[in-house]
A protein has these predicted regions:
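C-terminal outer-membrane/trafficking sorting elements
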Residues: 445-455, 459-533
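Histidine-centered active-site microenvironments of extracellular/periplasmic hydrolases
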Residues: 338-369
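Beta-strand segments within the central parallel beta-sheet cores of soluble alpha/beta enzyme folds
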Residues: 282, 330-337
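Short, glycine/acidic-enriched loop or turn micro-motifs at the edges of active sites
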Residues: 57, 292, 342, 460, ...
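Feature for exported/extracytoplasmic and membrane-associated proteins, marking the mature portion
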Residues: 2-314, 318-326, 345, 365-436
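Low-complexity, Pro/Thr/Ser/Gly/Ala-rich linker/spacer regions in secreted
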Residues: 433-446
Length: 533
């Protein structure tokens, strides 16, 4: 039996430590855990920490980040759930875009220069199943690929291929990644084994790691059992340092009550300040599958979704304030994500259905504050099939964090993503200059600078797309309203900057809206095109 199969078939994915902090069980992932390994290489260069906040269920990004500049189309598409324009909270330094009125905490972080929104994050040909879409986000695969390792886990496997032998050691005494809660994440799965294990009975866990079990037989299965016991012994050692770190912090800033996300983030702040060298923390918050009764009909600024967004906003604000109070905010950034967004058009049940691209938030004192991207394109008469077209591929968010926060060489970053992922990884302007090398990332394009156009528009069978490239690799994809990539018109390197044209032949395609997605370096734009009869 292979070690990987033995582990997967005999034990849950993560080992639950017999430690409880603030009422939450803490799961420590060892070095071979994907996300753990992605960050351990960074330990020789940086003491940076990443906090991943998973919003489970598929968050309605269009009601979270609201296109005020295109409010009439937004309202027409979802009048029964739309947020009144006068109630939308402005974002410091950003015009024409605001956030949900319940997110005053995040608005304060924008005002303090500690938050960034990235518009329309997704991937080509999205999947609308919760389980499959979550796997795609955690593994960084294509929608057509089955990848069984996590995006960060592959990096850690590259850094620490010999784990678990020799860990913990004098160079790294602490767990490399910690998930707060009771579930594990594919994000931390390595190519061969996920080093987190879940044991729900603390007594049996103690017996296993304290050596009170019978000797393992001299068989292949016995060797695997010895391996599991070795991991559990390491986990027990990690539980000691986690408890010591938690006990080292006796005072923290105030957190909101009745907020499970805030409870989790409070533990993270405590462990960071307490001295753990852990590089990645994972927390989760569910309830975002809002097919019905997303808002209160009498006041759309209230209701189920508003409550969720307020708790997320309040928790992140309290966490950031606590990091500042504890004197460690310069070491930590956070990232939110959900497995998909929602459709542009609301449904008759005062809710929204599974959709494609959606915004992400980054937060922390090292984040380049403001907004990356532009308001999503909303049709004048949106249908139930219309989705927000992708502007940024989520894998470019991951790769930028690995390169610019954990200071990994770009060529190594690229090697850690699955082959044929149908995207070119971009280095995006997410973080302030100097975090790793002092090299200032290229500024994002001025949204007013029109880079891609087409004529005629509307068109009957074909249209000519004109685009401006700065040289280098240039990509133009044709995407339908479901987010599927129908054609790739341009995928090549241009030796010099200039203006070029390419023909889009839509013969055989149904009439309706299509999007031309242009990507060149850090720049991308989406052009809506209408095919008529």
């Amino acid at each position: 039996m292979k070690r990987r199969d033995f582990l997967l078939n005999t034990l849950p994915a993560a080992a639950l430590l017999p430690e409880v902090i603030n009422g939450y069980s803490v799961k420590a992932f060892d070095t071979n855990s994907p996300l753990v390994q992605a960050l351990m290489r960074g330990t020789t260069l940086t003491d940076h920490v990443l906090v991943i906040v998973q919003l489970s269920g598929g968050n309605d990004g269009l009601n979270m980040v609201i296109p005020v500049a295109d409010y009439s189309r937004y309202f027409n598409a979802r009048s029964n759930v739309a947020i009144p324009e006068a109630r939308v909270l402005p974002i410091a330094g950003v015009s024409g875009t605001g956030i949900h009125p319940s997110m005053t905490g995040l608005q304060s972080l924008f005002n303090e220069g500690k938050a960034k929104v990235i518009q329309a994050v997704g991937y080509p040909t999205p999947n609308f199943s919760h389980f499959r879409a979550t796997d795609i986000w955690m593994s960084a695969s294509n929608s057509t690929q089955e990848v069984y390792s996590g995006w960060a886990g592959r990096y850690l496997n590259y850094e620490y291929p010999n784990f678990p032998n020799g860990y913990p050691n004098t160079d790294m005494t602490d767990p490399l990644a910690i998930q707060i809660g009771s579930t594990t994440s594919l994000t931390t799965q390595g190519p061969s084994v996920n080093m987190g294990m879940s044991i729900t009975n603390p007594t049996s866990f103690y017996n296993l790691v304290s050596g009170t079990t019978d000797p393992a037989p001299d068989t292949p299965a016995g060797k695997e059992l010895k391996f599991i016991r070795q991991v559990n012994q390491q986990t027990q050692k990690y539980s000691t340092v986690i408890r010591a770190a938690a006990n080292a912090v006796t005072q923290q800033a105030t957190y909101p009550t009745n907020n499970s996300l805030a409870d989790q983030l409070k533990i993270v702040a405590r462990l960071v300040k307490g001295g753990l060298k852990t590089r990645v923390y994972m927390v989760s918050f569910g309830g975002f599958d809002t097919h019905s009764v997303q808002v209160n009909a009498a006041d759309t600024t209230t209701g189920a979704h508003a409550t969720l967004l307020q708790r997320v906003s309040d928790a992140i604000k309290a966490f950031q304030d606590d990091l500042k109070f504890l004197g460690v905010e310069e070491r930590v950034i956070g990232m939110t994500y959900s497995e998909f967004g929602r459709r542009i058009k609301s449904n008759s049940s005062v809710g929204t259905d599974h959709g494609a691209a959606a915004p992400m938030f980054l937060f922390g004192s090292s984040v380049e504050a403001g907004m990356l991207g532009v308001n999503p394109t909303i049709p004048a008469n949106a249908s139930v099939n219309d989705n927000i077209p992708m502007q940024y591929d989520f894998r470019s968010i991951y790769s930028t964090i690995l390169e610019k926060w954990f200071c990994l060489d770009k060529t190594i970053v690229e090697s850690l993503f699955p082959p044929n992922i149908n995207t070119q990884l971009q280095t995006l302007p997410l973080l302030k200059a100097g975090v790793c090398s002092g090299v200032t990332p290229p500024p994002p394009p001025d949204p007013a600078d029109v880079i891609v156009t087409n004529y005629p528009n509307p068109f009957i069978t074909s249209t000519t797309i004109k685009f401006k490239t700065e040289g280098g690799h240039t990509l133009i994809q044709i995407i339908d309203t479901l987010g599927r990539v129908l054609k790739v018109l341009v995928d090549r390197d241009y030796p010099t900057a200039g203006i070029y044209t390419v023909n889009f032949d839509a013969e055989g395609l149904a009439h309706g809206i299509y999007y031309a997605r242009f990507q060149n370096g850090v720049t991308q734009q989406v052009r809506a095109m209408l095919k008529v009869r």
